[in-house]
A protein has these predicted regions:
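A short, polar/charged loop-to-alpha-helix boundary motif
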Residues: 452-467
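Short hydrophobic targeting helices and cationic amphipathic motifs
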Residues: 13-14, 19, 34
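Internal maturation/activation junctions in enzymes
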Residues: 349-448, 462, 469-470
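Bacterial N-terminal signal peptides
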Residues: 51-63
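Bacterial N-terminal signal peptides that target proteins for export
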Residues: 37-54
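Cysteine-centered motifs
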Residues: 16, 22-25, 61
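Noncatalytic scaffold domains of N-terminal-nucleophile
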Residues: 70-100, 104, 112-113, 117-277, ...
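Short alpha-helix boundary/capping segments
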Residues: 1-8
Length: 472
């Protein structure tokens, strides 16, 4: 672990696919030194300070050493998976082009919130399987000037006309209606959430943050091999609408190949409208009119009144401690409480005895995640409609009891794991990106369409691919 001082911050970005870690140590910096990283499948940002703060975290292979010594070692490590260092800021996302957009915003004088907004819109163009303006998510930020951690909740909401029986068969089982097609879409929250974050904490003009995404949609993006491949296996879902087929496949039905340019003219129009009119353009303007018209034609549920009623919400973060550090994450309906539960369970084990990447280490993590996710399935929900036993789920005593279920030489079977009863401890396909700037601001964003390519339904004339969150 990089030693934390009053003038240094260590930021760990963990790629859960390649297990790479990116570390930034804040010291007196040279201007113009920005770091961007792309092609990160999933990113989670861990922040250590003497005062201690954290957005999202997964940790296991932490060692000791000074910041300067660590940085020198990191710079010399000859691997594409080695940690990367940036002195003025860092942007990590799943797509290199979107990461470049964020780094450019930082270089233009924007802060981490500005860059996070720009990356969010850029990913809607460059990573349409998960990046979005038709989905939802959570933004967790440390605002350096105010010395506070805050959460922007832009989770989607069910349309007023939605009824449970619409999504169930005669046996009461969920049908594909909740996953594919226009009825699967909940009211999107991304545009409202990004605007709220910008209004509260951004610096640069709103339109400046959306301009890069608009240009990418208008001029086209050259597809990588991975992106071209993903359109192939997502083809069946994207048959849910003629607009999606027309946007992502050629006239003869064939897919775009790696190296070919994908132009999204309708999406460019939508982004331009949002740049000029803000979230109002999306929820109350011509975009809203087009959403309602297509919903009516295709049998969907979202109306203009649903869109006009939507609000993103700024919330207090959920927090706990891990080995002396305070950890902050998004509250329900996010899965942040599950992260805290897992860390509390891990706190009952001496991790220094485990070799990183060893069978024993992987076993411990797998069993911990099984326990945490079993409770997530049983107990988590939207606190506006359900009572979630938060205090119990993040209780140290509850975690200690759950940790006793882990057998060091035996893997548990999923069917054998039952949810615990955290109430006894009470009193009375998605993408992630992270941004840090030279001012000490830190932003962690997880947003999604639900499944890869969401519902597969695209609103005619807008390029907006909709989520399938009604299956949640």
């Amino acid at each position: 672990m990089v030693s934390a001082t009053k003038t240094s911050i260590a930021v760990f970005f963990l790629d859960c696919m390649s297990l790479s870690i990116c570390i930034e140590c804040r010291e007196p910096a040279k201007r113009g030194d920005y770091m961007k990283m792309g092609n990160i499948r999933y990113g989670l940002v861990l922040v250590f300070r003497r005062a201690s703060l954290l957005t999202f975290a997964i940790l296991f292979c932490l060692t000791s050493g000074t910041a300067a010594a660590q940085r020198q070692t990191l710079l010399e490590y000859p691997s594409i998976h080695s940690p990367q260092v940036g002195l003025q800021g860092m942007v990590v996302s799943q797509n290199e082009i979107a990461s470049e957009v964020g780094a450019r915003i930082l270089a233009e004088g924007g802060n981490a919130i500005d860059a996070a907004v720009a990356v969010g819109f850029a990913l809607a163009v460059t990573l349409p399987r998960a990046g979005n303006i038709g989905g939802d998510g959570f933004l967790t930020a440390y605002v350096s000037g105010q010395k506070k951690v805050t959460v922007i909740d832009f989770r989607s909401t069910a349309p007023q006309n939605a009824k449970l029986e619409m999504f169930l068969d005669e046996k009461g089982e969920e049908t594909d209606t909740a996953s594919v097609g226009y009825r699967a879409a909940a009211v999107p929250g991304t545009v409202a959430g990004l605007e709220l974050a910008h209004k509260q904490y951004g610096k640069l003009p709103w339109a400046q943050l959306i301009a890069p995404a608009t240009a990418l949609a208008r001029d086209g993006v050259v597809l990588s091999a991975d992106e071209a491949f993903v359109f192939g296996w997502g083809k069946k879902r994207l048959q849910a609408s003629e607009s999606a087929k027309g946007a992502f496949f050629k006239a003869d039905g064939s897919g775009y190949r790696a190296g070919e340019r994908l132009v999204q003219s309708d999406l460019a129009w939508t982004l331009d409208e949002i740049a000029k009119g803000g979230a109002d353009a999306f929820y109350r303007g011509e975009i809203a009119a087009r959403i309602e018209a297509d919903m009516q034609q295709q049998g969907g549920l979202i109306t203009r009144s649903d869109l006009a009623a939507y609000r993103a919400i700024e919330r207090e973060p959920l927090s706990s401690t891990y080995r002396g550090y305070t950890i902050y994450t998004a509250p329900p309906a996010s899965g942040g409480v599950t992260l805290l539960t897992m860390l509390n369970i891990l706190e009952n084990f001496d991790l220094s005895k485990y070799e990183p990447g060893s069978a024993d280490a992987v076993h411990l993590l797998a069993e911990t995640m099984r326990l945490g996710n079993r409770d997530r399935i049983a107990h988590l929900g939207d606190t506006a409609f359900a009572k979630v036993p938060l205090e119990g789920l993040i209780s140290k005593k509850y975690a200690a009891d759950r940790a006793k279920l882990i057998k060091p030489r035996k893997a548990s079977k999923d069917a054998a794991i039952k949810a615990g009863n955290p109430a006894d401890y009470e009193s009375p396909s998605t993408t992630h990106y992270s941004v840090a700037d030279s001012e000490g601001n830190l932003v962690s964003v997880t947003y999604t369409l639900g499944s890869d390519f969401g519902s597969g339904a695209m609103i005619a004339g807008t390029g907006i691919l909709l989520n399938n969150q009604m299956n949640n």
